Amino acid sequence: MQKHIVKDLELLAANAAAKEGFEIIRLEVLAQMKPMKIQLQIRHKNGSDVSLEDCSRLSRPIGEVIENSKLINQSYILEISSPGLSDILETDKEFATFKGFPIQVSTKNKSNSTILQNGLLHTKSKEHLLINIKGKMSKIPIDNVIQVRLASPTD
């Protein structure tokens, strides 16, 4: 399948999902399957868990925008799911469990702007989050941390 079609599908799905309060984490088109399969992973914009009912509810508007776009001229199966475990780290147990894993840290600076930093999780204390950024340890004050999210190694 041509890359521009996949990009167009991602944009259409993202817009439809946003109207319902969701964001698309991943869209994959398995064009070699018969019928073709379009797989979407979603999450709530507010970070809450995604239910089976949420996936079902989002299926109709996303299916409609795909059909109306005429980008796909063959039969397909639309699968909508959640990515599984929440990728946002919140509890001390989660921070301990995912030590050494790639993370993305959202922080605020003095001017209240949001900054994203990617690195490997080292430790979290009441005062600091310690992450390894390209071999260099970075100590981030907990008061500046907005959110810590598991990331893929390529992020």
From Swiss-Prot:
Matches recorded under InterPro entries: Ribosome_maturation_RimP, RimP_C_sf, RimP_N, RimP_N_sf
SUPFAM superfamilies: YhbC-like, C-terminal domain, YhbC-like, N-terminal domain
GO terms of biological process kind: ribosomal small subunit assembly; translation
Key words of the record: Cytoplasm, Ribosome biogenesis
GO terms for cellular component: cytosol
Subcellular location: Cytoplasm
Primary localisation category: cytoplasm
Family under the similarity heading: Belongs to the RimP family.
General function of this protein: Required for maturation of 30S ribosomal subunits.
Protein name: Ribosome maturation factor RimP
Organism annotation: Prochlorococcus marinus (strain SARG / CCMP1375 / SS120)
Gene encoding the protein: rimP
